[in-house]
Amino acid sequence: MKKKLALILAATMMVGALAGCGGGTTSTTESDPGTSQGETASNLRVGVFYYNYADAYISTVRTAMDAELESLGVEYQNFDAQTNQATQTDQINTAITDGYNLLVVNVVENASPDAAQNVVNAAKAQNIPVIFFNRDFDVSVLESYAESCAFVGTDPAEAGHMQGQAIGEYLVANYDTVDLNGDGKISYVMFKGQEGNPEAEYRTQYGVEDANAVLEEAGKPALEFYDSSNTQKYLVDQTGAWSAQAATDYMNTILGQYNDGNNNMVELVIANNDSMAEGAISALQSVGYNVEGGDKTIPVYGVDALASAVEKIDAGIMTGSVKQDGEAMAATIATLVGNVQSGAALMDNTDQYTLATNDAGETIPNKILVPYSLYSAEG
């Protein structure tokens, strides 16, 4: 089912001075003086630290988060690390010094737990609660500050599994059409957002593995990476920004050698996110593929179900995406912020959410998972 979500802005926003290297927004709204308890709007100061404003998905989270925090009536400031962990660390340390008493952190580096642990150590020294979101890391960080630290995100493997299953089912149903050169195999390119990021690693792995499992069950050969000399079987954004431009540049280079004229056109695009999927589409359109109303289309899959990607899917330009619900993530974070504001425990009022489990199947009490859903033209 196609899901369309809307947010109603509950308060007006006053834009203040830029903060840190990336800048930010301070927003203060009046709360009902007769109902606030605990950390009210007068003394709760929330620092929200984003790894990169330019990330299209993060932009949706930020818009929704601003609305949620305004609705709560808290003072907050946004900070943009611009994919630089040192910048973010400086922003957080300065915010603590400046009196911010709740940190909401989209950590830049998560290939190891070090950056997140440093945030926790700094916050714990001042008894400041921390809410991490979106970019996952080792659970030991949460355990080190269990009563005052939480994570809101997604199951890193789920999007890869959903994407791979959808790709496999689509190919089985449309195999001869997708097999442009009629060689009985499907060639693909995989665009990876970042090295070491759990979401990127699992999406890169399962987007192909699960598709191959469906193909094998249907008696079809496994997918073949278009460039047999590439042993990694993916192309990564070297900046770690999951950017459309990286995919466009890669795809333009690919099309110079792998094309209709050489009878070896890439037949499938798999991307870790919608931005990279859309970047690949830009390059494809330059050679007449994936144009609305055109007669030459190769399947392109992404993750996030951004509004721009949904439009492309509806128009037949893109094939499918896995929705990562930015509005739901922001609303979940706002529940935790509201707990701090009212003086409740950080994880109070969360019975409606899904908690993560560890490898032993034990519940992780301060790690909330926001579910994914598939978006495709088929519904």
Residues covered by each model-derived region:
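Hinge/cleft segment of the Venus flytrap/periplasmic-binding protein
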Residues: 42, 182-195, 199, 211-212, ...
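Beta-alpha junction/loop-to-helix N-cap segments that form part of ligand/metal-binding clefts
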Residues: 82-142, 149-156, 274-277
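Hydrophobic alpha-helical segments within soluble ligand-binding/sensing domains
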Residues: 88, 150-185, 202, 244-251, ...
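Hydrophobic alpha-helical
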Residues: 108-126, 207, 231-311
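Flexible loop/hinge segments that line or gate small-molecule binding clefts
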Residues: 119-158, 162, 174-185, 191, ...
